[in-house]
Amino acid sequence: MTLSGCGGNSASDAKSASGAATVKVMVGGLDKVIYLPAMLTQRLGYFKAEGLDVELLTEPAGVQAETALISGDVQGAVGFYDHTLDLQVKGKKVESVVQFSHAPGEVEVVSNRAAGSIASPKDFKGKKLGVTGLGSSTDFLTKYLAVRDGVKTSEFTPVAVGAGQTFIAALKQGSIEGGMTTDPTVATLVDQKLGKVLIDMRTPEGSQEALGGPYPSSSLYMNADWVDSHKQTVQKLVNALVKTLRWMSAHSPEEIAAKMPADYAQGGKALYAQSIRSTLPMFTKDGVMPENGPETVEKVLKAFNPNLKSAKVDLSRTFTTEFVKKVPQG
């Protein structure tokens, strides 16, 4: 299925063999619990029920999903909402059409080796800290936590280590002393006694404490022009994803885990279910942007991002609730 996000080739023109509209979506790590609604929607058959043939592709970092969207390789990206602000300042019109979460789902961990010397972000000075990729949301949030606690972004080194096994290997080898990651990586490294949790942003309370408000993170975001010219397709995508968020709110972590591909539970079924349990509080039940969420994200990004510091961001153009408000009830 080759489909370009710009030009004449579009989801409304492209049909799969079954006659369903074809949409390509790049996910910043399909096996990350923070992006779980994407694959779960596929597994529950909700995309198909809406008459869509959705191809889910994966990249280890959200920033790579953003790149695929901007280049027109895909029509949608599942990644952090904060990319929409960053892109607007760079002259790109991108908007979140459904918001999966109201907290980052991220955790700052420290290796056992470094635990004695890192008690808070004040101690980031001189340290090597893992992020999924440079320019990724983990990079953004690490920089914010440092700046908030009086450490300049030039005083520590962010290291791109991805997530999962590559993150764990970097921690084991000592090439990073800590870093920001999500479940199931967090559950695995704690279970293997390789490190401990320093800052937990998997819940709205954790987001409030670390960032001063709700931090809408994982979302489906798309080029605004594409959204405007494919409203029917976007509505179907949003219907399917919101149906999944509702399903998640009514089922146990074990029931959710059982629906996912078996290879996502690399640390075993029980540990995978535990990682879902830890991250579940971050998800919305309706896909609606949380109140004050965009403002929190703007405040966080402006604290350290020179591109955004003095820029005027039109937050109303970074997301839309047009589609989530039209999702059928029940």
For the regions a language model picked out, list residue spans one by one.
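C-terminal motif of bacterial Sec signal peptides marking the signal peptidase cleavage site
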Residues: T2-G5
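Short, glycine-/small- and polar/acidic-enriched structural segments
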Residues: N9, D13-V161, S175-D183, L198-I199
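Soluble non-cytosolic domains of exported or imported proteins
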Residues: K32, E59-V63, T132, S136-S137, ...
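Extracytoplasmic/secreted envelope proteins and their assembly/folding machinery
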Residues: Y35-A38, L44, E66, Y81-T84, ...
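Short, solvent-exposed loop/beta-turn-alpha elements that line the ligand-binding surface or hinge
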Residues: A49, G116, S120, R202-G213, ...
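Pocket-lining segment of extracytoplasmic ligand-binding domains
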Residues: T166-P261
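Secondary-structure end/capping motifs
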Residues: V227-L308
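Conserved C-terminal helix/tail region of periplasmic/extracytoplasmic solute-binding proteins
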Residues: E295-G330
